[in-house]
Structures are given as C-alpha cells and as structure tokens.
Amino acid sequence: MGLLVLGTPLDWPESKKYCDYVRENGIMQFLHMYDTYISKKQDVLLWGDEIECIVVSMDDKSKKARVSLRQEDILNALGKYEETFRHVDFGPVYAALRNETCPKKIDAILSEVAKNPADYVERIGGNSNKDTIEITSSTKPHAQNAVPTFHPEYGRYMLESTPGAPYGSTLKDFTFVEYNMRLRRKIIENHLLPNELPLTITNFFRLGTPGFTDPEVEANGAISRSFFLPDDVINTHVRFPTLTANIRQRRGRKVAMNVPIFFDKNTIKPFHDPTVPWDRNLFPEDANARDGAALDNHIYMDSMGFGMGCCCLQITFQAKSCDEARLLYDQLTPITPLMLALSAGTPAFRGYLADQDCRWNVIAGAVDDRTEEEMKTVPKSRYDSVDLYISNDKRNLPEYNDVPVVINQDCYDKLIKDCIDERLAKHMAHIFSRDPLVIFSDSILQDNSVSNAHFENLNSTNWQSMRFKPPPPGSDIGWRVEFRSMEIQITDFENAAYSIFVVMLSRAILSFNLNLYMPISLVDENMKAAHARDAIHRKKFWFRCNPFPDASTDDESGQFRQLTIDELFNGEHRENGFPGLITIVRSYLYSCNPDAKTICLIERYIRLISQRANGQCLTAASWIRNFITTHPSYKQDSVVNDEINYDLIRRIAKIVDGDYDDTLLGKCS
C-alpha cells in the first residue's frame, strides 16, 4: 500500500471538478521526473518483496475463526518496535542463521531476535562474525542490515510487511530472504493477542458471512452499503473509505463480483443464494441485486473489501536504467498469468467453494469504477492485466499491442510535444485516461518540480499485473517495475521460493537477452485461463516457442503455441521442444558460479516450483479445496461452515509452525 496522505478528502461530486486539473499536473510531474532522471543509472539490480497477511482471531470454545479488527493497535506496536531497533545492524543475525542447520535452533534465534534484536546481536558479539553478505555500497541500506517494516492495508484485519531496505544483486542475497520473511512473521506474532494468528492466505474463507469479525459488527454501513461487509472492516485512514465510496458513486451503483459456484453433489441447483438479503431496502443500491447484479449459480459479492481485502505477494525490481525497466516490464508481462496459475490460492469466497482458484478477477471487479455506459467502450477495469508493451526494443513489434486501448488524447499530445516517445506516451496516456479517485483538498496545489502526488494519484490506482514506476523526486531510488499477479502462499518457504524464482527469471531474461514478446490478446487469454479450477492440469497457456536471441522471427504467427504449466516450467519432453523456464533459471544460476550452500538452498526453491508445475505437490488452492471437501462436517453442498473454517485455519497454522504437509510442500522443504 502506497504512502497515506493526511488531509481532507473530497467526495465524488467535489472530486469531479478537479479530475482534469490532477491529470494535467500529474503529467507535468511525470515530465519533470522523466527529464530529471532519464539519464540516471544504477550500478546494481535491487529488489524487494511485499507480503500481506490476515490476522485471525481464534475462539477455541465455540470453534470459530474470525478476522481481528485490531490493525491500528497492532501497527502502533509494530511501529514502536521499528523505531526502537532501527539502528540495530541485523547482519550478524542473518549470518548466524545462515550458519545454523538445526530447525529448532533457527526458530529459537528468530524468536529471540523478534523480541529484542539488540540484545541478541550484543550477546553474539555484534559485527564480529565475518560471514556477512557483501554490500556494494556501505552508504546504502541493505535488507540484511535493516529492521523490517510494517504497513497498513485496506482491510482492518490485514497487515503488510517488507524488508527494511532492498535486497542486493548477488545470489548470496537469496540465502536470507526466507529468514527475513520468517522474522517478520515472528515480530508480528509477538505483537498479537494470544488467540490471534498472522496467516499468509489469499482471503479469509468466510469473509462476509454472519459474525465473521472480532468484534462482531453488523453490515449496514453507508460507505460501501454492502449486504455482507460492515464498513468497520475498512482501514480507518480517510483514503480508504473515500476510495470505497467514490468508486461506488462514480459507477452509479455498487460494485458487483460474481464468481461461479462449485457444484457439488448436494449443492442447490439452480443456485439462488439464500444468504443474500434480497428484500433489504436500507439504501437505494440494495435494489442492485434484485435488478440483476447478483447472478444465479454464482457467489455474489458487493463491496470493495472482497477484492482489496485479499492478500498477495508482490515483487519490485529496480533496474539499471529507464530502458532496462521498460524492457523488464514487457518481458515479465507474459509471465504474470503463468505465476498467477502456479500460485493459485483462492478456492472459496464468502463461505462457499468456487469453481475457480484465483482472486484476480474479484479484485478487478471490486475497484471497477466504470459507469454502465463506459462498460461498452472501456474494455477493462482499472485493476486488470497489462494493456500495452512499452519498450523501444526492436523486438517489440507493433502487432503485439493488439487489444483496444483507451487513452487521454490531451495527455498523449502533451507527452509527444515534450519529446516522450510514442510507446511510453501511449502507456501514460492510457493510465491517465482514468479519473483520480481520491483527491485531498489540502493537496490540490503542488509544486510539480518537487512533488509527484498527482502523478501517483493515477499511477498507483491503475492496478495492472505489472507497474512501471519512475524514480520519486528527491531520492536515490531508480527506475522500477512491480510484478503484481502472484497470490500469497501459506508458508514463508513458499513465498521465498516464488519471489526468488521470479527474480532469477528476471535476471536470466536480461543476462540471456531472452525474447518473451507475444500478442497482448494472448496474455489476456492466459489470465482468464489462470483462474480456472486446477488450471495447472486443466488449461493450456500461450507462449513463445523459442525465446532465445538466435530464434528466427520470419514467421511470427508460428512463434506461439499453447503449452501446459508443466511444459512451460519443466520443459517439453521432445526434440526441439520448449526448454522450460526452470531450465533457463538453472542455466543462469550455474553461470554465476555460486558456492555449494547457495546452490543447495536455491535448488530447494526451484524444486518446489517444479513440483507445483508437474503436480507432485498441490497449489494452495487445491490443497485448501481438498481439506474442505474431505472434512467430516462437509455436506457436499459447497458450504464452508464455521467448523471447517476453524479446523482449516488451525491446520494452516500448524504447517506454518513446521508440521509440514508433503502434499502441499512436496519433498523440498
């Protein structure tokens, strides 16, 4: 979640008056950043992860699990931890962890550091341990040395954590990513109540059912006007309720997401959801469901919280230059649907099993601010897959940008006039075709030479599967791209594996000069396929057959084929078949001549990716679905009741604590 500005937000009728002003000045801010930083070069590639979690309150007597609405109290306590220990060098901690092989001792170190890192570092002799990660520049903060940071998210039951500084560019940096994630979880645990758990699950399986919050609150709020989610689940910072209300007001009706129900043996057919309060007349929008917004045979959701209340795993890369960032943006775009399918973790919504496994289309619907008229002319929600490639690489052929794209013509003309190339200008004009959703009255007048707030107002509320991020004014941060499609995983081991795999793939793309370009329409088709229940086994995905530099491009139409996830990651078992992304990543790994310990660790992560792709172990979605459908109290009616939900949460917590399940984690952990 981006920077939260303090001030007085405008409601939608007032905001509309300033939309053109914000767009005009946002473009001016972009031009100033571009002119200032276009020549900026970075010595090394840096990266970082964002992990979101849900805080669950467990009631062992009633066997109920509910989301805890104590985000503000928890973050205040975590903020004090950060401030208290921000001068501590965590380097010796990671050195000690890297040299330890006993799982119990590793856990003990993490537990001690989570309570008081200063005491632990002093006890082991401070910086005397020589086995630390080499830092390129001693003047720059590094994830190894910094206290982790914690941030608010949309839901009052959610937390976001990041390393306190970026990871470096060496393979050795990968050896403490998982420890950093585990430490963040331990720190959070230390600031929770005894009955609370921080779980990295994509969504709470009974979100929106009666009594799902702790404390219990009735769903009758005027902000979202939801049948199911009380306004109390929304972060109290004024940005979030304003965003929620302004999306509803701009579109002229409540948001509406309909996910197909999974039909089991005893599921009601046709499924006309009995939990929808069809006759409620508390707000004018209550008629939406009766008027067709709620579809039969689907799970109906009517609030932004059903989407923005989901957790995900995001990776940000700092490139060496603007050109390299644009190339990475393009080359990783075809990877986004593949990683969405491989990370699938969302088989249930609002207490029902769904006939899909991913969150993406639910979030897209949750922030879809298009009016009914715009639905006919604007193809996508502002949260969706990438629409345009943006690099000037000669392999970026015009025919690859083959989907209709709405742009703001005035913004485009201004960018072209100021010497921005056509591809980047079109991308920015597309981003600026949307309206700004939250405008603060205190922040309308800005100095465009020192502020990027108007630019970020639009860039940060276009939630695409990749995001292009210019350097912010007055910082030493470089040109960045953000990989946004992955679902959060249950364990820190999995989240580290997925993060490191994507980072290594990005390095391989640059190192081997790979060409992954394909028509955007095929990427869109892949995004839809990724949502399918058990997409890994039931769907095929378009991809470029030969990504290597020496591949012929004479017949572009024959360059793309549909492959299974197994074939895409593990390769085709035939002559001249696709080698597999894992083969490419391994080639990069061994070209770097890492030490044996580093190879051993990274191979564990690669094996998890490989086994997920070939079905030797399950995706989180399949594992959760299997748990639900085999639970003694499951009635084959698609309902995830309180008992199932409670037991599932308990089982997940045990796995996180080390009671590994080979069906989920394979033989890698």
From Swiss-Prot:
Domain of life: Eukaryota
Catalytic reactions of this protein: L-cysteine + L-glutamate + ATP = gamma-L-glutamyl-L-cysteine + ADP + phosphate + H(+)
Keywords in alphabetical order: ATP-binding, Glutathione biosynthesis, Ligase, Nucleotide-binding
UniProt keyword annotation of Ligase present: yes
GO molecular function: ATP binding; glutamate-cysteine ligase activity
Biological process (GO), any one: glutathione biosynthetic process
Alphabetized InterPro entries for the sequence: GCS, Gln_synth/guanido_kin_cat_dom, NA-bd_OB-fold
EC number: 6.3.2.2
Pathway it works in: Sulfur metabolism; glutathione biosynthesis; glutathione from L-cysteine and L-glutamate: step 1/2
Main EC class the enzyme belongs to: ligase
Entry's Gene Ontology cellular component terms: cytosol; glutamate-cysteine ligase complex; nucleus
PANTHER family: GLUTAMATE CYSTEINE LIGASE, GLUTAMATE--CYSTEINE LIGASE CATALYTIC SUBUNIT
Annotated function: Catalyzes the ATP-dependent ligation of L-glutamate and L-cysteine and participates in the first and rate-limiting step in glutathione biosynthesis.
Family of this protein: Belongs to the glutamate--cysteine ligase type 3 family.
Oligomer and partners: Heterodimer of a catalytic heavy chain and a regulatory light chain.
Name of the protein in question: Glutamate--cysteine ligase
Organism expressing this protein natively: Schizosaccharomyces pombe (strain 972 / ATCC 24843) (Fission yeast)
Taxonomy of the source species: Eukaryota, Fungi, Dikarya, Ascomycota, Taphrinomycotina
Primary gene name: gcs1
